[in-house]
Regions:
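Short, charged cytosolic
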Residues: 5, 9-33, 175-187
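Short intracellular "coupling" helices and adjacent cytoplasmic loop segments at the cytosolic face
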Residues: 12-22, 42-44, 118-123, 142
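Low-complexity, highly charged intrinsically disordered N-terminal segments
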Residues: 16-53, 57-60
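Alpha-helical bilayer-embedded segments of polytopic membrane proteins, i.e.
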Residues: 42-88, 115-120, 173-185, 200-250
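Membrane-embedded catalytic scaffold of the fatty acid hydroxylase/desaturase
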Residues: 80-200, 263-354
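C-terminal, active-site-flanking charged/polar segments
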Residues: 238-251, 255-256, 317-321, 326
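C-terminal, non-catalytic macromolecule-binding modules
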Residues: 247-272
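C-terminal regulatory/interaction regions
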Residues: 354-365
């Protein structure tokens, strides 16, 4: 059934019978059914094939970069690199969730190589941040993904903004996607700050070596081969595409879904399902979003390999229907519209930095 709300049409379900089993036990039964279907088994052949494909794609970009030389067509190579680096980051994300190998060490090894050595991001920073997010998605004070930043993800934070940030937050819905072009730089800056910071960093020197080497090699190659202006344009396009793709892939997952107040306790099943949004689109969506289109299933079963998510979706939807838990899935276009609408609505709570309090009082007289 389709229901219309301020967040747009979502798929909802009938209400749960109060006589049914507690959600904790129903999640346990769902997990048992998923395991019985073999959906928690690793898919090494799939991931090795995907890795080989991405390595070939990266090799093609490098070959094109060398062959084109001093040409503005290099910007197409830059855009392609942004896409390929994002796909490597998706694969690193899956390795961090133990989706590739049975061994945790093997997954960490692959994830660190892909995230730090190929994408140029700190694997330990990502693991720390992402683990907290999965434990408490969209919960104020516990999910770092909705902590105060350039934009605001909930009303109270927007209302507390001041100065230039308030000016951005007031228009953040319309500015959201343009701002994503800077997300690549933001991710690299956070990664460098983490590995060189005072906090605990797992395998610090290895990550420093991988991240610094990756960034240095790309920058050096670009400035050695291309003229100065073209080199800056190349890096600008690569970083913009990388940031936009990463941000646009993760944005529909939770933005516009219910935000859980600080201190509120929910059972695992509801906490994960009610705050997550799936993207309808079949195989193409799974490829483009790196499996993130099955966000509900990913949060319920973080170690589930990408090829099994679609089959799990049918089981989870039916389970939520029986239990009366809202299960949200939308087209990619509708999800982005909802993201913009939600961000604009939150932004209305931001203070106008040019507003005169005295004039405001006169207006109310």
């Amino acid at each position: 059934m389709t229901e219309t709300s301020t967040l747009g049409p979502v798929r909802s379900t009938s209400r749960r019978d109060p006589n049914r089993a507690h959600p904790t036990s129903t999640y346990t039964s769902l997990l048992a059914s998923i395991r019985e279907e073999g959906l928690l088994q690793r898919s090494r052949v799939f991931y090795m094939s995907l890795l080989a494909t991405l390595v070939l794609a990266l090799g093609g970009c490098i070959a094109g970069f060398i062959l084109l030389g001093d040409s503005w067509f290099q910007l197409l190579i830059a855009a392609a690199l942004g896409i390929v680096f994002t796909q490597f980051a998706f694969l690193g994300h899956e390795a961090s969730h133990r989706q590739v190998f049975e061994s945790g060490k093997a997954n960490d090894r692959l994830g660190r190589i892909l995230a730090s050595g190929v994408a140029g991001l700190s694997y330990s920073w990502w693991m720390t941040k992402h683990t907290r997010h999965h434990g408490n998605p969209n919960q104020i004070g516990r999910d770092p993904d909705i902590d105060p930043d350039t934009v605001s993800f909930y009303d109270a934070d927007a209302a507390a903004t001041r100065g230039w940030r308030a000016a951005i937050v007031r228009r953040q819905g319309y500015l959201f996607f343009p701002l994503l072009t800077f997300e690549g730089v933001n991710l690299h800056v956070h990664s460098i700050g983490h590995i060189f910071g005072r906090g605990k960093v797992d395998r610090r020197w290895l990550e420093i070596t991988l991240v610094v080497a990756r960034l240095a090699v790309v920058v050096a190659a670009v400035f050695l081969v291309l003229p100065l202006g073209m080199a800056f344009a190349f890096l600008g396009v690569q970083l913009a595409v990388f940031g936009f793709y990463m941000g646009a892939a993760f944005a529909p997952n939770h933005i516009g879904m219910p935000v859980i107040p600080a201190g509120t306790k929910l059972d695992f099943l509801r906490k994960q399902v009610l705050t997550s949004r799936n993207i309808i689109g079949g195989t193409w969506a799974t490829v483009v979003f790196g499996g993130l289109n099955h966000q509900v299933e990913h949060h319920l079963f973080p170690s589930m390999a990408r090829p099994h998510l679609a089959r799990a979706r049918a089981m989870v939807r039916e389970h939520c229907r029986i239990e009366g838990i809202d299960y949200t899935e939308q087209t990619v276009g509708r999800s982005y519209i909802n993201v913009i609408q939600y961000m604009n609505r939150v932004g209305l709570h931001a203070r106008d930095p040019f507003n005169c309090p005295a004039l405001g009082n006169l207006r109310r007289v």
